[in-house]
């Protein structure tokens, strides 16, 4: 589909003129298959989704159609391809797990049972992937994995009902930031952390299908913070004029209160680890947001942020 917000990072970065891009609806199998067959990909990263919890309460049918049948359609393209790809990664969410509100991070072998329509649709997407993997690719001819990523933040996100975009919008209006759930704990991480993990998983299973599996992708325990703490860090990074207030909603739809991931499997299998702690993550996010608000050079700021890859040294 077209980017769902105006502005959006795809347009701001001028990517349309720098890559082959096909706009379409993943629910439309015929159109998806035509684009898939034309591309003949060797590696497939499935990130298309309706990704907002609160939107899933407003339109659960669309959420399930997109997140469940969209996954079915994508895997049908893989199954029926004349030359199937060698590596497929389905990106789901940390919210696929049955949330017991306990202090431990969920592991990949925990029960999948998301509560709200968004989370549950992603649990279903996991099960669909598992079924296709067992039913049609048990010979390992196509290496298929899923990645269950924690809450992603960073510059260039303009979605509704997400904490960092809400913070930036408030700063643009010179208003106090309203926080709905300041005491909720989430595995927040900069967007480049999971993106690096996705590419790593896709590459390694392309080279050796024994790496195919199910992987949590999230921050270290020390960076699993409350939303209130996250916004404190945002305000510190932003500087003068940044402040927030608790705007809890009395009849808000259910959202998990405490959620953490155990990423031991990803770390031990690939030697992966997060590169930025939350304070540095927020500094990068605020820097990007200020460049955007001032009408600065977004592609140049993205290049600066991508120096992330050199931070591993």
Regions found by a protein language model. Name each.
Residues 270-299:
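A contiguous, mid-protein "functional segment" used to position or interact
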Residues 100-105, 109, 117-118, 123-206, ...:
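NAD(P)-dependent short-chain dehydrogenase/reductase
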Residues 58, 149-156, 178-189, 210-225, ...:
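Glycine-rich Rossmann NAD(P)(H)-binding loop
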Residues 27, 58, 66, 116, ...:
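Residue-level signal for the nucleotide or nucleotide-sugar donor/cofactor binding architecture
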Residues 1-149:
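N-terminal Rossmann-like NAD(P)+-binding domain of SDR-like oxidoreductases, especially those catalyzing
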Residues 177, 201-215, 294-300:
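Core catalytic loop region at the nicotinamide-binding pocket of NAD(P)H-dependent oxidoreductases
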Residues 167, 197, 204-252, 262-263:
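Mid/C-terminal beta-alpha module of Rossmann-like enzyme folds, strongest
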Residues 308-313:
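Conserved small/polar residues in nucleotide/adenosyl-binding loops
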